[in-house]
């Protein structure tokens, strides 16, 4: 496995449908189930564990980016630096090593002065992931 598309060939279609959907959760759950099945098949066919855990982290990166992009994080549309909030992967996932039953550890880093500005989006984002 060398690319994310080879791991999950429907990512472009998933990106489009998730961005347009009012209810993305069923689409995301189906994509995760398809990805798990694909990984089981790849493992059975001899794909190295190192490749599988790296591909899993890359796939989750893509899913999280789709979820994150559903929200408007911009605070200052006239500035070059529009937002002062970041989603950061930490732990094994942050190292690009995501085992099948590992937690997905995330940190939302935000400038203290802007914390209230994003509270509703953060709550909705976390609810979507939960």
Over which residues does each language-model region extend?
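Amphipathic alpha-helical segments in well-structured domains
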Residues: 122-125
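N-terminal regions immediately upstream of nucleotidyltransferase
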Residues: 1-75, 79-83, 101
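Catalytic metal-binding acidic patch
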Residues: 86-119, 129
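A general structural signal for short secondary-structure junctions and capping/turn motifs
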Residues: 79, 127-128
């Amino acid at each position: 496995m060398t690319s994310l598309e080879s791991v999950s060939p429907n990512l472009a279609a998933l990106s489009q449908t998730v961005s347009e959907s009012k209810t993305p959760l069923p689409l995301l759950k189906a994509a995760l189930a398809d990805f798990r099945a694909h990984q089981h098949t790849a493992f059975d066919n001899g794909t190295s564990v190192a490749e599988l855990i790296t591909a899993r982290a890359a796939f989750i990166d893509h899913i999280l980016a789709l979820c994150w992009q559903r929200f408007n994080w911009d605070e200052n549309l006239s500035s070059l630096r529009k937002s002062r909030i970041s989603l950061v992967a930490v732990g094994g996932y942050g190292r690009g090593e995501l085992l099948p039953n590992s937690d997905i550890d995330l940190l939302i880093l935000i400038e203290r002065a802007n914390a209230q500005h994003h509270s509703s989006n953060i709550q909705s984002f976390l609810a979507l992931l939960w």
